[in-house]
């Protein structure tokens, strides 16, 4: 059995106790309006969408975590039967993921 990483554990806590949106269109819309606290993107996200998210997130001072796995792996990690290229975090709930990302950026 594979060992669960800190990110995976915190993501599961986030999904259980927080509020998120899935998908690049919804996430970009939420980043533009400043309604998300952070963004998680899969490594396989199309470059044009990645550039848009990074640009809008920089303007809005929203941290972005780049997940090393594919959209399929991120979807599986989230317990979904479909690929997830982006996750917009509206409320982190009991997860420490947002704090860990901010600490890592310093």
UniProtKB/Swiss-Prot annotation:
InterPro entries the UniProt entry points to: Ribosomal_eL30, Ribosomal_eL30-like, Ribosomal_eL30-like_sf, Ribosomal_eL30_CS, Ribosomal_eL8/eL30/eS12/Gad45
Protein name: Large ribosomal subunit protein eL30
Entry similarity comment: Belongs to the eukaryotic ribosomal protein eL30 family.
Record flagged with keyword GTP-binding: no
Keywords tagged on the record: Ribonucleoprotein, Ribosomal protein
One Gene Ontology biological process: translation
UniProt xrefs under Pfam families: Ribosomal_L7Ae
Assigned GO CC terms: cytosolic large ribosomal subunit
GO molecular function terms noted in the UniProt entry: RNA binding; structural constituent of ribosome
Classification via PROSITE patterns: RIBOSOMAL_L30E_1 (PS00709), RIBOSOMAL_L30E_2 (PS00993)
């Amino acid at each position: 059995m594979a060992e669960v990483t800190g990110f995976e554990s915190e993501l599961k806590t986030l999904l259980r106790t927080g509020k998120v949106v899935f998908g690049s269109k919804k996430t970009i819309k939420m980043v533009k309006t400043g309604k998300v606290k952070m963004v998680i993107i899969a490594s396989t996200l199309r470059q044009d969408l990645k550039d848009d998210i990074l640009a809008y997130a920089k303007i809005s001072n929203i941290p972005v975590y780049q997940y090393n796995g594919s959209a399929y792996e991120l979807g599986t990690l989230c317990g979904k039967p479909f690929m997830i290229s982006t996750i917009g975090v509206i409320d982190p709930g009991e997860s420490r993921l947002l704090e860990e990302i901010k600490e890592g950026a310093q």
